[in-house]
Amino acid sequence: MSQEATEAPAMPGEGHGHNKAKARWLLGTDRKRSRINRTRQDLWEDTSWSNHRLSRATSAPRGTRARGTAHGRSEASPENAARERTRVKTLRQAFLALQAALPAVPPDTKLSKLDVLVLATSYIAHLTRTLGHELPGPAWPPFVRGLRYLHPLKKWPMRSRLYAGGLGCSDLDSTTAITTGQRCKDAELGSQDSVAAESLLTSPAFGNK
């Protein structure tokens, strides 16, 4: 009995040790969890930082490429400007040469490109009719027929004839054409009358009278 009484008080001590071991186990579990959480957080931070650096590294070539493209454009723009100036100069020289080839136009006349084209069309049509060839199309296209109303008489006194047939009579302005034709006929009749009068004065019969 005394031995049982002596061993009986040992039970509470064993329970306290068990509780203490359980507390240590729980503390160790909490520490492991906190370590795992810290590890996960560190991994997340490292991953986000790596992604950030990767995005910056990816965007850097784009910016460099954009700056390179802009730099290339700035280098090419003077060449484009030079080509455009050359094209405009060549076109202007061609129109000046075409205007110089047209008769009945004073050398220092200032005409627009449209005026030069209308005069050239009129002159070509006049030469075609003079050679007895038929025109491949209408002598005056519809867009040319109304130009006399868009271009009033300006720097050149003969400009009114520019849209009245230029060098010849056309159906662009019938009134001007009829007037010009009548003047030509009057000039021809006057020359014929003067020739007849001279022949009459120099004839022997007139001298005998």
UniProtKB/Swiss-Prot annotation:
InterPro entries: bHLH_dom, E-box_TF_Regulators, HLH_DNA-bd_sf. It holds the Pfam family HLH. It is found in: Nucleus. Highly expressed in the uterus (predominantly in myometrium), ovary, and testis. Expression in the uterus is higher in the diestrus phase than in the estrus phase and reaches a maximum at 7.5 dpc. Expression declines towards the time of delivery and returns to the non-pregnant level 4 days after delivery. Low expression seen in lung, heart, intestine, and spleen. Keywords: Developmental protein, Differentiation, Myogenesis, Nucleus. GO terms for biological process: cell differentiation; decidualization; muscle organ development; negative regulation of muscle cell differentiation; negative regulation of transcription by RNA polymerase II; positive regulation of gene expression. The keyword Nucleus applies. Both the bHLH region and the C-terminal portion are essential for inhibitory function. This is Transcription factor 23. It comes from Mus musculus (Mouse). The lineage of its organism: Eukaryota, Metazoa, Chordata, Craniata, Vertebrata.
